[in-house]
Amino acid sequence: MKIRIQKLIVIFFMVTSGFSQNENRFTLVGEIKDSLTRTHIPYATISVLDTNTKRVHAGTISDEDGRFHLEVNLSNFYVEVSYIGFETQKFTKLTPSQNKIDLRTIFLKGNSEQLEVVNVRAEKSRTQFKLDRKVFNVGKDIASTGMSALEVLNNVPSVNVNIEGEVSLRGSTGVQILIDGKPSVLADDSSNALGTITAEMIESVEVITNPSAKYDAEGTAGVLNIILKKEERRGINGSVSLNTGTPDNHSVGVSLNKRTEKFNLFTQFGAGYRSLPRDNENINKNKNSNTELLSEGYAYRNEIFYNLILGTDYHINDRNVLTLTGNYAFEIEDQPSKIYYQDYNNTVLENKWNRTGDTEATNPKWQYDLNYKKEFRNNKEHTLLISALGRFFGKELTSEFLNSTTFGANNDKDQQIETNFQQADYTFKLDYTNPVSKRFSIEAGSQYVVNDVGNDYEVRDNSGMEFIVNPDFTNNFEYVQKVLAFYGTTSYEINKWGLKLGLRIENTDVSTFLTNTQTANSDIYTDFFPSVHTSYKINDGFSVQSGYSRRIYRPRLWHLNPFFNIQDNYNIRTGNPNLLPEYTDSYEFTGVYEFDNISLSSSVYHKKTRDVMERIAVFDDTTTTSTLFNLGSRKTTGIEVNGKYAPLNWLSMNGDFNAYQFDRKGTYKNQNFGFSGKRWSSRLTTKIQFPLDLDFEITGTYNSSYKTVQGQMAGFGFADIGFRKKIFEGKGVLNISVRDVFASRVRERVIDSDTTYQYSFSQRGRFVALGFSYGFGKGEAMSYSGGRR
């Protein structure tokens, strides 16, 4: 039969500060499962309604394990539990016992007919605060239309992505990016990372600033875990979506799943074309000789991309599940560029020339993931997980750069570049969890990771008759890293207090080989990574946690490879094969406050890092070459506040603020690079819900200026806006978004010393996107996006 779900106004975390008591106050708890498959139902809606007015008094949604916990202050009430595609259950005549009502396990039955009318479905909060992490729910971010995963990260609290695609967490770039809790070929931290993952594919992003020993120790700043959508509703469900935008950003996406008693089959496919322009400007000045080189120009990254995910869950029985997932992505790149040079001597223009570049590349990526999970009879939290993951990324790139003189001395030059890059990674994991008792649990596991990378780089100069290999810029660089890890954690909870101790041991075997110089480097080392976390629940509205962990950030191939990037012959970047890993000791104290319409998370943190990797620029007349070195230590102390406030049913605000002070110590070639500085950033998002299912969202972001090892980065602010309109009775969604409304998001750096002056500026500009999506079966409309900034 057809069911019309009553319009819900769901207020998340309806809890009080607990400093006062009320005779009608009680806690409502329970667990929700599918009556047929006996699997948990996450994100089901639990509503407490006033018996007299029939209006919603309080509400929440079930978590990933189908559980819910809700504080209620009402005497005459009834409870409704609902989920799309299932019959709503109603509970009346409930009486609290010792200020608590336990509904135990609630089994929802599937509807025999498809829901045709859904007025309002309970929505997850945009940001959820937990003691050990923050969860950013992408579906609630209206401005995500037209975004890629990289742009989604830039909207996540504590995270910043600059216009070069570099991801930082609380100002530190040592970030480990995972997908569904695992490393992925789609999430490496190169400039092309996350390009084929789109906002439509993402359920949420978890920000973990102080991970336990269970997590890979990689990433001194912490962990960003991107959770992809994986539909598990019974029957056939799906969504299709279309996006278009300017600059060129066009994509189509399809998501399908079919769930039976034994199998859950799922697939996602996306394809599109996007154009990513960037304007650049540079000034290199030698104060001693009074010579100056000015350059300005543009570069485009035009991409055709495809991404296909196929997977299945096989429920062998109630306690054993086998999951197999495959992912294939392919990108075709075209990167035209042009730079205009002007060479001055004592303010007199002497030479002018242009450098035109044309780069073409293909990037195949594939990955497989096999998992087996066993739940033991005595407790469903008693589990064994075995997984094997393989991934491959390749890049075949050809470039040609042509210098054309327009004034002065002859600077004509014709160069070709050919790159063949291949990376293969293999990860094997075993994780065991045993809740020995209600208060005591243990975790143990191991992991073995192999990274095998090769980069064949060749530069050829035109001699007039033919192109001849330039040995100064040509090399074949090989990099192999093997990491074997073991970990164990134990946790104890009593009343309102909890303690978790952990230790991780990692043995690293890394080797590099530079073919053209026959230079080999190798290193084997073992590290211990302890972690300590403790928490105390002062009352239902206020909890605190403190934590300590030790982390590592190992140099990547592009950090180690000494090849020169010659796209701009006067601003060159190169790697250093002698780099050592960074080590960080991280301390943090966090409080989470939850009131009637306010949630607040505040943290004080301190980090100590040694062997800091820093890029140092070396000036030679008007040419700048920047290379990475290990420069001493860094101490960082900061405060971070994240909050959400919903003063009215139609108005909500989310904000975050991060400020820290840092102290750097280090020397290079007898030059002191020690300095101190401050940096802060803030973000505020306001969402307004209008009648007729129309939502509006505006986000303002500001990043302050700050000191670098050799100069100063300028501060900047930018704004994004978005509109969303539900149509076709909620099955369709129309989105419009404008990112960087005022074209003010820039990267601007100044290095000013006694002998040299360098200025660099780059900008992407405004992006506008329009998206439409439609859900069928029991699915909902989604907003597939194909863009990346």
Which residues are covered by each model-predicted region?
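Outer-membrane beta-barrel translocator/receptor signature
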Residues: A217-L224, E232-E281, E303-Y306
